[in-house]
């Protein structure tokens, strides 16, 4: 290949025709979410992509561990091209409200950045995340940012094995 692919899937892709869609942003539930036969993992998860090179993620950092609703959070992560070809990677930033009044998805994509890296090159990818982007509709259908703990995740796809994680606290 003269061209190194760098696209990412906009959906989770099932393993077989009979498997229901497995969404990256499914709601947390105590009910059984699997199947009688087979597992409930997709063949390829949301954000998955192919490349002729490999990338490694490291050093997820945030500038504050405690924030107010009107603050802006700066998130950064190091990405390295560990392969022998130049390539582009799409770094994905997810959030999760750990203790929400309403049921929210396990992961919510909040931002992404495309970064080009030469073989062996390492770059720090930075995100500016207004705290208000952590919000959602409450039980009265009003947009609100709840006080409490939120998980910030960065990686190459929505799969847990690919995500670096840290936690912040939102204060009212």
Language-model-detected regions and their locations in the chain:
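Secreted, periplasmic, or luminal enzymes acting at the cell surface/secretory milieu
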Residues: 1-88, 94-96, 147, 151-155, ...
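Short intrinsically disordered coil segments
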Residues: 72, 94, 108-110, 142-144, ...
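Terminal connector regions
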Residues: 130-172
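Intrinsic-disorder/low-complexity, polar/charged segments enriched in Ser/Thr/Lys/Arg/Asp/Glu/Gln
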Residues: 72-74, 122-126, 163-165
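Generic structural detector for well-ordered beta-strands
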Residues: 56, 61, 78, 111-118, ...
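Short, hydrophobic/aromatic beta-strand segments
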Residues: 86-93, 105, 138-139
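Intrinsically disordered, low-complexity Pro/Gly/Ser/Thr-rich segments with frequent PxxP/GP/PP motifs
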Residues: 101-137, 141
């Amino acid at each position: 290949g003269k061209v190194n692919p760098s696209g990412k899937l906009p959906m989770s892709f099932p393993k077989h025709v009979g498997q229901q869609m497995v969404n990256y942003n499914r709601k947390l539930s105590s009910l059984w979410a699997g199947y009688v036969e087979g597992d409930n993992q997709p063949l390829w998860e949301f954000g998955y992509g192919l490349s002729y090179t490999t990338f490694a993620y490291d050093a997820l950092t945030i500038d504050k561990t405690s924030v107010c609703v009107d603050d802006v959070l700066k998130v950064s992560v190091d990405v390295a091209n560990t392969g022998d070809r130049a390539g582009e990677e799409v770094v994905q930033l997810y959030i999760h409200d750990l203790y929400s009044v309403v049921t929210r998805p396990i992961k919510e994509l909040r931002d992404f950045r495309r970064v080009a890296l030469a073989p062996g090159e390492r770059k720090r990818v930075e995100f500016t995340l207004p705290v208000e982007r952590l919000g959602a509709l409450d039980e009265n259908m009003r947009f609100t940012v709840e006080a409490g703990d939120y998980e910030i995740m960065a990686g190459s796809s929505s799969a847990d094995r690919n995500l670096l994680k840290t936690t912040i606290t939102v204060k009212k």
